[in-house]
Amino acid sequence: MELTPREKDKLLLASAGMIAERRKARGLKLNYPEAVALICFEIMEGARDGRTVADLMNYGRTILTADDVMEGVPEMIPDVQVECTFPDGTKLVSIHEPIV
């Protein structure tokens, strides 16, 4: 199977997001890379499901709370940006202060 660098990046992010999702389900507090991966993964999946950019920007702030992550992680993530493929093309989704 031949993948472009962008496809490899998306696959790696999806894998990391699924691992973070499992750890969160087990009650573990997520670290910085896990938190970012989970937020990005959920946003990418939402785009694939047909949600709008505005909807995903709002949804991105509800994925994780400060109780879901290790101490200090919310302050380390002032914003998250992820390129997603929508039916009408690729768009950048920005989530400001994703963990409250």
Swiss-Prot record:
A Pfam family the protein falls into: Urease_gamma
EC number(s) from the headed UniProt entry: 3.5.1.5
CDD domains (alphabetical): Urease_gamma (cd00390)
Record flagged with keyword Cytoplasm: yes
Keyword Phosphoprotein in annotation: no
Location(s), subcellular: Cytoplasm
Alphabetized UniProt keyword annotations: Cytoplasm, Hydrolase
PANTHER family named in the record: UREASE
Stated name of the protein: Urease subunit gamma
Organism name: Aliivibrio fischeri (strain ATCC 700601 / ES114)
Gene behind the chain: ureA
